[in-house]
């Protein structure tokens, strides 16, 4: 959004007609639908429109992990060497929440809208790591605003027997419920 590739009002990217591994990916996508379903082709299209140098500069600017993007033409989130810890993700999310990066307010509002997950006011993003067509890792990073303050959470799960972003989200929700932060 900061580069004008999409805007808060105009962020639909047309589906290219390719058969993707998840039915929810096989349609036109908005920022919200792409974030909700982790639609890699949408995010890759944004990266390609920006160009690899600009994308890498952006992630370096915000300090996204070790910024080891490799040469993956399918997008750095599809198996590159980028490494970021749960703590680093929370620190990055806090900076984004406070808008320490100086992004336009409407860009921040559009991203917040795209990652709103439930009626408890929990915002976040899930991710699933796959190896040989098996889900082996799940993560969730998010925040919730309450009368007592804003709480940030990150959960990373790894299991050869199966783990995914939905399980990490459920785990994070249960932690927040156990701490009486959400109902």
Regions found by a protein language model. Name each.
Residues 23-27, 31, 43-94:
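Mid-domain, small-residue-enriched loop/turn segments at the edges of structured enzyme/sensor domains
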Residues 8-14, 46-47, 67-73, 100-108:
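Surface-exposed patches in mature extracellular/periplasmic domains of secreted proteins
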Residues 19-20, 40-42, 65-66, 73-83, ...:
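Solvent-exposed loop/turn segments at secondary-structure junctions
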Residues 1-13, 34, 153:
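Active-site SXXK
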Residues 33-35, 42-45, 66-68, 142, ...:
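Structural recognition of the beta-strand scaffold that forms the well-ordered cores
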Residues 48-51, 94-183:
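Structured C-terminal helix/loop/strand segments within mature extracytoplasmic catalytic/sensor domains
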Residues 10, 85-88, 137-139, 149:
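Envelope-exposed proteins and targeting segments
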Residues 11-24, 33:
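Acidic helix-start/capping segments at beta-turn-to-alpha-helix junctions
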């Amino acid at each position: 959004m900061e580069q004008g590739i999409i805007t808060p009002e105009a962020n639909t990217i047309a589906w290219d007609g390719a058969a993707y591994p998840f039915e929810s990916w096989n349609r036109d996508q908005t920022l919200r639908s792409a974030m909700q379903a982790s639609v890699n082709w949408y995010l890759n299209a944004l990266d390609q429109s920006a160009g690899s140098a600009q994308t890498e500069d952006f992630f370096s600017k915000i300090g996204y992990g070790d910024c080891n993007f490799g040469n993956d033409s399918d997008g750095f989130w599809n198996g590159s060497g980028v490494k970021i810890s749960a703590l680093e993700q929370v620190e990055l999310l806090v900076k984004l929440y406070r808008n320490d990066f100086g992004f336009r307010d409407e860009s921040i509002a559009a991203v917040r809208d795209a990652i709103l997950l439930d009626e408890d006011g929990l915002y976040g993003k899930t991710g699933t790591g796959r190896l040989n067509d098996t889900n082996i890792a799940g993560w969730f990073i998010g925040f919730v605003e309450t009368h007592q303050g804003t709480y940030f959470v990150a959960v990373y799960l790894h299991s050869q027997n199966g783990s995914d972003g939905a399980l990490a989200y459920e785990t994070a929700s249960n932690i927040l419920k156990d701490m009486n932060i959400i109902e």
